[in-house]
């Protein structure tokens, strides 16, 4: 037998050493790949859970933002309607002192024909102004003889009531009050019986 037919002890050791580790290496490699896959799967599962949580937060923020925008639009619509409804309020409030002055001018006695004609012109001017104010929603607050209402009347003075029916009622109007649509422009200044 030649040397080639019988492997030497050294060669046998090499073959045995190489054949065992190959199986072990394959097992370890398979185990390593499995561990690597498990780690990757865990990472991916964690990433998916994080993304789902982030998506949930973003969806919540989106819904809240959408609701806030809707609320802002509703508030804007209401405010705009209020502005349109009460756009003449400041003008009406500014005209009230002029109406008061015209009424004071009418309370003066007219002695001669010129004064009477002047008074008649002032009355016509006041009537036209009152009509224009009514046409735009400004009306005088009823005060004389009615029950005192703090939302419409301002009590400037109180007097003793002559009878029980007169208690808490307006007995004298010192200055007329006016309402514009459903708002009080100026409360009537009144004397109330107690």
From Swiss-Prot:
It comes from the Bacteria. It comes from Lactobacillus acidophilus (strain ATCC 700396 / NCK56 / N2 / NCFM). It is found in: Cytoplasm. Its main location: cytoplasm. GO terms for cellular component: cytoplasm. This is Protein GrpE. Homodimer. InterPro entries: GrpE, GrpE_coiled_coil, GrpE_head.
């Amino acid at each position: 037998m030649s040397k080639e037919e019988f492997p030497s002890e050294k060669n046998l050791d090499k073959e045995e050493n190489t054949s065992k580790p190959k199986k072990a290496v394959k097992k370890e490699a398979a185990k390593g790949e499995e561990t690597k896959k498990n780690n990757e799967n865990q990472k991916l599962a964690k990433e998916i859970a994080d993304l789902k949580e982030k998506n949930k937060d973003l969806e919540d923020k989106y819904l809240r933002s959408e609701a806030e925008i809707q609320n802002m639009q509703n508030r804007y619509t209401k405010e705009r309607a209020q502005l349109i409804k009460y756009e003449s309020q400041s003008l009406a409030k500014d005209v009230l002192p002029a109406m008061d002055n015209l009424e004071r001018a009418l309370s003066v006695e007219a002695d001669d024909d010129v004064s009477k004609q002047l008074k008649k012109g002032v009355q016509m001017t006041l009537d036209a102004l009152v009509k224009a104010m009514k046409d735009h929603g400004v009306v005088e607050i009823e005060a004389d003889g009615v029950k005192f209402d703090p939302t419409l009347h301002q009590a400037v003075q109180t007097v003793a009531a002559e009878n029980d029916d007169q208690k808490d009622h307006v007995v004298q109007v010192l200055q007329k009050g006016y309402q514009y649509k459903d708002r009080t422009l100026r409360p009537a200044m009144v004397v109330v019986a107690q």
